[in-house]
């Protein structure tokens, strides 16, 4: 099935919404702006280049309190690595934005893989009942599909970083969702999804 898009808003075109930037075809230099663009990544080397580029822009765009850059570094690496290790998708996508007036950093990481629920169902240890249950498990310490490829602390660590800084975080995967907003956590179910095999995670 092919789609034709007409009259694309200038803002979406500038973000590369329909044509994400490929790290392999775009040389990222230290002076390049990696923010406000959608990037596609396929492997750990591309993750490394993107994380370094995004963090370089963060440092020069906004004055961050102690520990913020380290937290962003850790969170980006962990969650983007989750895409490579667990999603079974060919690639993932990432975009980072800074709102200078509010001093907020927004980061979105997406993949169209099998989803957290189907990934954890392959585990011999964990047996989530549904997608919301799987997401709630994923933000607990030490939960992973396979201990040989990860310690299971990525989502848990990011959740705690956001929580301690009274930030906001949302996870949507398959039919389930979880939101954390200034210390208040909620889960959602029966979210619409396009494909049973590619449940996707954001």
Language-model regions, residue ranges each:
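Flexible, glycine-/charge-rich segments associated with ATP-binding catalytic modules
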Residues: 22-32, 45-46, 124-129, 140-202
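Acidic ATP/Mg2+-coordinating residue in the GHKL
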Residues: 111
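STAS-like cytosolic regulatory interaction modules
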Residues: 1-57, 67
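Helix-loop-beta hinge of the Bergerat
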Residues: 34-64, 117, 124-141, 160
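Glycine-rich G1-box
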Residues: 114
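Short beta-strand element(s) in the Bergerat
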Residues: 103-107, 201
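Conserved ATP-binding N-box helix of the HATPase_c
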Residues: 66-101, 159-162
